[in-house]
Structure formats: C-alpha cells, structure tokens
C-alpha cells in the first residue's frame, strides 16, 4: 500500500505545483481561465502520450493519477464557466466549454498518436 501512496503523493504534489505555477505565468491581461485551459490542454496531451508509453504501475500512479490528476482541473473549469455565466457573459462561457472540451479531446487523441509513434 505504501509503495503506491508514495509515487501517487509525489506526482500529486508536483502536478498541483505545476498548475499553480502555470496560473502565475499567465499574463494579467489574459483571462484568469487561461492558466487552467493551458493546464487541461497540457494534461490532455500528456495523458495520451503516457497511456501509450508507460507500462510500470508505479510510474502510472506517479505520472497519470498523481501528476496529471492534480495538474488538470475540472473543478476550476466548472467554477470559471459558472462565474462567466453569472457575470452575464454567456458567449465567453460557451467558448470556455468548447475550448476545454474540444481542445482536451483533440490533444488526448494527438498524445495517443505521439505515444504510439515513439513506443
């Protein structure tokens, strides 16, 4: 059990830190939602690559469940979308939904293709 908790915890700490740093790196002129969008897109691409290339269970726990689970954020995406709707910005909310969903699906597919190519 502990042999699973350690890589999971390390990955989660690194993923949460990466998401926080990514949000700090987004210029103030851009939407606050942009940092989470980049995090979700990065995670979508990486999960495709990792799913194709990582076979060891401990590395899957560290990188996929821990790191990518903490890097990507459905709760942040949900809050951003609802906040846009509450701010009477339905077009921005729809754009946010489309960009997160379509972009993440496309990048996961691309990641799977990249992972299969380098395997």
Curated annotation (Swiss-Prot):
It is a multi-pass membrane protein. The gene is fluC. Na(+) binds at residues 69, 72. Belongs to the fluoride channel Fluc/FEX (TC 1.A.43) family. GO terms for biological process: cellular detoxification of fluoride. Na(+) is not transported, but it plays an essential structural role and its presence is essential for fluoride channel function. It catalyses: fluoride(in) = fluoride(out). It holds the Pfam family CRCB. The keyword Ion transport applies. Fluoride-specific ion channel. Important for reducing fluoride concentration in the cell, thus reducing its toxicity. The chain crosses the membrane at residues 5-25, 34-54, 59-79, 97-117. Keywords: Cell inner membrane, Cell membrane, Ion channel, Ion transport, Membrane, Metal-binding, Sodium, Transmembrane, Transmembrane helix, Transport. GO terms for cellular component: plasma membrane. Its main location: membrane. It comes from Neisseria meningitidis serogroup C / serotype 2a (strain ATCC 700532 / DSM 15464 / FAM18). The keyword Transmembrane helix applies. It is found in: Cell inner membrane. InterPro entries: FluC. GO terms for molecular function: fluoride channel activity; metal ion binding. This is Fluoride-specific ion channel FluC.
